[in-house]
């Protein structure tokens, strides 16, 4: 593992870890940063699968007590069964649409200009959702009904468009559908587990020939870095939302998206042939 490969792994691991669970689109940031540091092709596809697993492991670790309680409670406790059912219901739409359209979306939409547009549009929607008065029906994830879960599951599918943000779509969707900010955020974290693991397993099997033994040190470094920074992001976000809205993330999305569009419009960076 040479110095440049290690540096690329660290940079992309940091980006994945910090952005995966913030409502600012990890995929969008990965596409932009990978293009800037010239990390692309088949190796990048395999690497992205690994660092996503690092990020999701951070959430599993952070919520290990809740996961343990749910697993133990499945045979005898109705709240544990309801919570599990809600996760499966919310997960299902992404499975169906992902299998049907993932390749087409990756081929035509995985580029910096699409990311920039989605960042701006998503930021505007986020500002509108935060300023809109909405009645809180659900204070805790255990109080959710199946129809809350299903609606959030459909909204999550919007995140197939790079730049939209999986966490952003599910959190804002949760707010619009009556969840408290804490409940929407926590359910987004829990929903990430089956969604991201499922996507990683599917992609890992589909592109299994891309994994080469020689890449193991670089992939392991990216995995560890992603795990560490995802832990920082998850804990930081849970503390942040206790006293703040998501407006700061909305303004960041808008500013970052406009910056990308400006570099394209004025020819400062050639995004026309960029790919994730």
UniProtKB/Swiss-Prot annotation:
Q: What does this protein do?
A: Catalyzes the dephosphorylation of undecaprenyl diphosphate (UPP). Confers resistance to bacitracin.
| Family assignment from sequence similarity | Belongs to the UppP family.
EC class (word): hydrolase
Q: Which organism is it from?
A: Pseudomonas entomophila (strain L48)
The UniProt transmembrane annotation reads 43-63, 85-105, 109-129, 183-203, 214-234, 248-268
Other noteworthy facts: Bacitracin is thought to be involved in the inhibition of peptidoglycan synthesis by sequestering undecaprenyl diphosphate, thereby reducing the pool of lipid carrier available.
Q: Name one GO cellular component term.
A: plasma membrane
**Official protein name in the record:** Undecaprenyl-diphosphatase
Q: Which cystines does this chain contain?
A: none
- GO molecular function terms noted in the UniProt entry: undecaprenyl-diphosphatase activity
Q: Which reaction does it catalyse?
A: di-trans,octa-cis-undecaprenyl diphosphate + H2O = di-trans,octa-cis-undecaprenyl phosphate + phosphate + H(+)
* InterPro entries in the record: UppP
């Amino acid at each position: 593992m040479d110095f440049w490969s290690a540096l690329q792994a660290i940079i992309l691991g940091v980006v994945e870890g910090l952005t995966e669970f913030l409502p600012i689109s990890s995929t969008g940031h990965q596409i932009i940063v990978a293009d800037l540091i010239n990390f692309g092709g088949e190796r990048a596809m395999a690497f992205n699968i690994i660092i996503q697993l690092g990020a999701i492991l951070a959430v599993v670790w952070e919520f290990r007590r809740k996961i343990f309680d749910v697993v133990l409670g499945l045979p005898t406790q109705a709240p544990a069964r309801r919570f599990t059912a809600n996760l499966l219901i919310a997960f299902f739409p992404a499975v169906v649409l992902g299998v049907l359209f993932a390749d087409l979306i990756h081929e035509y939409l995985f580029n910096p200009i699409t990311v920039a547009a989605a960042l701006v549009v998503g930021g505007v929607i986020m500002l509108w959702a935060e300023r809109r008065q909405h009645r809180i029906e659900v204070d805790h994830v255990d109080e959710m009904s199946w129809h809350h879960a299903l609606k959030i599951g459909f909204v999550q599918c919007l995140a197939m468009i790079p730049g939209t943000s999986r966490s952003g779509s599910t959190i804002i969707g949760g707010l619009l559908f009556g969840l408290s900010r804490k409940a929407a955020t926590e359910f987004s974290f829990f929903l990430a587990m089956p969604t991201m693991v499922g996507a990683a397993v599917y992609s890992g099997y589909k592109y299994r020939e891309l994994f080469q033994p020689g890449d193991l040190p670089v992939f392991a470094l990216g995995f560890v870095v992603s795990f560490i920074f995802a832990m920082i992001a998850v804990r930081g976000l849970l503390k942040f939302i206790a006293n703040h809205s998501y407006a700061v993330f909305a303004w960041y999305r808008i500013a970052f998206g406009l910056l990308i569009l400006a570099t394209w419009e004025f020819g400062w960076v050639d995004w026309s042939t960029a790919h994730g």
